[in-house]
Amino acid sequence: MIGRLRGIIIEKQPPLVLIEVGGVGYEVHMPMTCFYELPEAGQEAIVFTHFVVREDAQLLYGFNNKQERTLFKELIKTNGVGPKLALAILSGMSAQQFVNAVEREEVGALVKLPGIGKKTAERLIVEMKDRFKGLHGDLFTPAADLVLTSPASPATDDAEQEAVAALVALGYKPQEASRMVSKIARTDASSETLIREALRAAL
C-alpha cells in the first residue's frame, strides 16, 4: 500500500501529476482543488495517496492532506460513486465545501457537479451525513469555507486545450467542456486558472 509520496514534480498535466521518488516516476490523479496547491515542476511535493486496484489498471489518487484523503475514501464507499466520480466531486468543490453542502442538504449545489443527478445527490447526503458524525475530528469544521491559493503559472499557447482535456477527464462531455472554457478564456491565463474558473462558473 502506497500511502504517502515525497518527491520532485516532473510534470503537471491536470488532473495528473508525475512525481519522481527514488528514481521512480509515479502518476498520481488529483482533484483539481488539490492540484491548484501543488508547487511548480522541479520542486518537491508531499502527497498523501490512496491506491486503487482494478482489473485493468492500478491507480494512485493523491491529496494534500489526510483529511482530503479520508473524505475521498468515504465517498467511494457510497453506492454508485467510484474513484473517478469522487475525483470529479472534489474537483468541483473543495473538501470543506462538500462537507458543508452535505450537512446543509444542498441538493441543488451537488447536482451541478459532473455525473451527479438528483438521486445520487440525495444518496450522498443521506449516507455521508451519517458518516460525518463519527469523522468530524478527522475531517473539517462545519460551516467554514476552505480558502485555496495556488502558485502562479505562466500561460501557455495550449492552455485552453489542456483545460478542456482536464474537464473531460473529470467527467464532462467534450462539447460541454469546450463551452465551459470558451466562456472564461483569456490569453494570459494558465490551464490551471482556466480549469478553476470554469469549474467555479459551473457551480
Swiss-Prot record:
Region annotation (Flexible linker) ranges? 143-154
The gene name on file is: ruvA
* Record region (Domain I): 1-64
Q: What does this protein do?
A: The RuvA-RuvB-RuvC complex processes Holliday junction (HJ) DNA during genetic recombination and DNA repair, while the RuvA-RuvB complex plays an important role in the rescue of blocked DNA replication forks via replication fork reversal (RFR). RuvA specifically binds to HJ cruciform DNA, conferring on it an open structure. The RuvB hexamer acts as an ATP-dependent pump, pulling dsDNA into and through the RuvAB complex. HJ branch migration allows RuvC to scan DNA until it finds its consensus sequence, where it cleaves and resolves the cruciform DNA.
**Organism of derivation:** Shigella sonnei (strain Ss046)
Query: Sorted alphabetically, which NCBIfam families does this protein's record hold?
Result: ruvA
Cite the GO molecular-function annotations of the record. Answer: ATP binding; four-way junction DNA binding; four-way junction helicase activity
Q: What is its main location?
A: cytoplasm
The family assignment reads: Belongs to the RuvA family.
Q: Which spans are transmembrane here?
A: none
Region Domain III: start-end pairs = 155-203
Write the protein's name: Holliday junction branch migration complex subunit RuvA
Signal peptide range equals none
Which GO terms of type biological process are on file? DNA recombination; DNA repair
Q: Which GO terms describe its cellular component?
A: cytoplasm; Holliday junction helicase complex; Holliday junction resolvase complex
Has the keyword DNA-binding been applied to this entry?
Answer: yes
